Each structure stands twice: as structure tokens, then as C-alpha cells.
Amino acid sequence: MRLFLSLPVLVVVLLMILEGPGPAQGAPEALDTSSGLDKLKEFGNTLEDKVREFFNRVKESDIPAKTRNWFSETLQKVKEKLRIES
């Protein structure tokens, strides 16, 4: 039964491989080097601003302190349980 099912799959895969690459799609428009660099620079500046804003929000929030406290408390509880059981 396995051979019966795997042979058609093998035939389809071989046909796909032997068919070769598909027809070429339209060539993308050539961008000027300067406009491409300007777009890349603008993207980099935008990304930099967003990352700075994100890190500033994280620094100003109390999430890191709360997370650190939660981990400390949980670790302390685990240590206490291990001391009691051993």
C-alpha cells in the first residue's frame, strides 16, 4: 500500500523538477543608486528612532523591576520548598 501511494508522489516530484524554472516575471525597475541609498538611510533613521523610543519606554516603566522582583520571590519559594523536602 505504501509503494502504491508513494509512486504517484515520486512521479509528480520528478515532473516538477524536470519541468525547469518557470517563465521569468517582469524585470524590476532599476533604481538610481542615490535614491536607493536615500531610501535605505531614511529607513535606518526611522528604525533608529523607533528603537530609541522603545528602549526609553522600557527604562521609564516599572516592568523590569516587577519582573526582577517576581523572579526573586519565585526563586526564594522554590529554595524554601527544596529545604523543607530535603
Curated annotation (Swiss-Prot):
GO terms for MF: fatty acid binding; phospholipase inhibitor activity
Signal sequence region: 1-26
Record GO biological process: lipid transport; lipoprotein metabolic process; negative regulation of cholesterol transport; negative regulation of lipid catabolic process; negative regulation of very-low-density lipoprotein particle clearance; triglyceride metabolic process; very-low-density lipoprotein particle clearance
Record's keyword annotation contains Oxidoreductase: no
Entry-linked InterPro entries: ApoC-1_sf, ApoC-I
Pfam families named among the record's database cross-references: ApoC-I
Family of the protein in this entry: Belongs to the apolipoprotein C1 family.
Miscellaneous: Apolipoprotein C-I is present in acidic (APOC1A) and basic (APOC1B) forms in P.paniscus, P.abelii and P.troglodytes and perhaps also in baboons and macaques. The two genes for ApoC-I arose through a duplication process that occurred after the divergence of New World monkeys from the human lineage. In human, the acidic form has become a pseudogene sometime between the divergence of bonobos and chimpanzees from the human lineage and the appearance of the Denisovans. Pseudogenization resulted when the codon for the penultimate amino acid in the signal sequence was changed to a stop codon.
Protein name per UniProt: Apolipoprotein C-I
Natural source organism: Ateles geoffroyi
